[in-house]
Amino acid sequence: MALDALKGWTSAQKHAVAAAYLGWTLDAFDFFVLTFVMPDIAKQFDVNIPAIALALTLTLAVRPLGAFLFGRLADDYGRRPILILNILLYSLFGFATAFAPTLSVFLIARGLFGVAMGGIWGIGASLSMETVKPGARGFVSGLLQSGYPSGYLVASVAFGAVHAAFGWRGMFMVGLIPGILLALYIWLAVSESPVWQRPATVKAGKHVVHLVGVAVILSAMLAVLIRFGREEGLVYIVAAIVPLLIVAGVLTPFIRKHWKLAVYAILLMTGFNFFSHGTQDLYPTFLRVQHHFDDATVTFITVVLNVGAIVGGLFFASLSQSFGRRRTVILVALMALPVIYFWASAQTAAMLALGAFLMQICVQGAWGVVPVHLNELSPGHVRGTFAGTVYQLGNLIASINAVFQAELAESGKQFLGLQHYSLALAVVACFAALLIATMMFLGPEARNVEMGRAAPASE
């Protein structure tokens, strides 16, 4: 199945897929660095963990802005140059985080990183899916999405190798040089998507308007979240998120034109993002704070879970090529349900590692199908924008997860013997698995659809 998908690849196809995978891996690394050092940053700035969890919320909440802005640029100027720009920007903003003197500056740096991070998935997925042959899309989808747990795995190793010697600030410095080298590799070795066509005319003024709009919305969100989010929690976070959803729906032409598909895809991606972020983002904190494990044990468990994630993503994405996108995701989402209690309630390092391994097989097994499924459903002329934007709007809704889980963990509530972070992890995982299975059951499938040549993004 996977071996057949690897046959007969051209050099251009190999480089395109490698670029998309590595771009998403490095992006995920820069994101997950924070999840390992939240207790250290909370101590540095003399705040509690929910206040630092706001940085995760902020990073996720602003990603739709990057998906829209960079997606439009990629539809008009090509996937390759905008992918390079994206990688350089998120590497620079990730590096800048290390020098934040105050919590507010730290949050602003993570917000800017989130905008750059928002563009990378949609552009990389479009480049790879438009380049490879249809029969290889399932495997490539799983490979591309495995970049996310690969980045998490590298962050796990970096935590074990760097944290003790250089602290949390040193962790944020690691990604800069790899980012520059990756951008250079794409510039020298990667070809433009064979599907993308340069528009006859590109209205530069349109992109200025988009950029100004993104800057205004980003500034407003940063102001609300930083001013009120730390003290008032979810109420003000939702107050910042809801207007952005309204603006996105009203002002984005391709969402207005394809609103039924967009609403469906956003709800679907809301479930997917709760599934991943709800089982991953606070997991290192769960290991450090609730179980009091040392750096080596945390590294071991997170490496094991990410191996499971990579295996699950590659296997089930490849399976979807013959079994179907919808049926594969429904199967894996339902498989997660009996695993959740064991995963959240285990007490020893060995049992926690086993539970995390099984859980992430399910989580990334479902996620592995997402790149190909969204790109097959997307309208061709705005594929670079549509897939990335609906993905990140789902991320926007799910961005409340980190603060919600941190506050629930510290509330003292108990259910079925679960408490603290165990309860917070289990509640979100169960909700997300059921939502994903329901949405996939209700939704369409476009397996192996002919993507054709993308027309200019004139909307």
Go through each PLM region and give its residues.
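Paired small-residue
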Residues: 89, 93-96, 104-112, 350-358
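Cytoplasmic helix-loop-helix junction between adjacent transmembrane helices
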Residues: 109-146
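Conserved MFS/SLC helix-loop-helix module at the cytosolic interface between two early adjacent transmembrane helices
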Residues: 65-103, 323-326
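Extracytoplasmic gate region of multi-pass secondary transporters
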Residues: 34-35, 214-244, 248, 252-310, ...
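Helix-loop-helix hairpin linking two adjacent transmembrane segments in secondary transporters
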Residues: 144-187, 204-210, 223-236
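Cytosolic juxtamembrane N-terminal segment immediately preceding the first transmembrane helix
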Residues: 1-31, 36
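C-terminal transmembrane helical hairpin of 12-TM major facilitator-type secondary transporters
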Residues: 320, 326-370
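Central cavity-lining transmembrane alpha-helices of secondary-active solute carriers
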Residues: 57-72, 124-125, 303-315
